[in-house]
């Protein structure tokens, strides 16, 4: 059972969780028209990042982190993390979605 991604249902609200690998290579500038990768995530989802999306962390989200879904392919995604969680390069952990693809040919993972 290599898939560690799961979907929790709290009341009427579905919250997808993803087991991700935090990438070191995320230091590239945000795409044109966005002030940061966090701004990119917020504009693509239409939501405010709020708190860190790492499960169990409740600090303010300050970074748009580059991650890959563990056992999920080579696609890169952006997810809001606090700076402390984002600098744990190479770590695997659960995050709450949605995940926004870095390459726009892929769909947002809700």
Protein language model annotation of sequence segments:
Residues 37-62:
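Short cysteine-rich loop/turn motifs with clustered Cys
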Residues 67-70, 79, 94-101:
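"Short basic amphipathic alpha-helical interaction patches in structured regions
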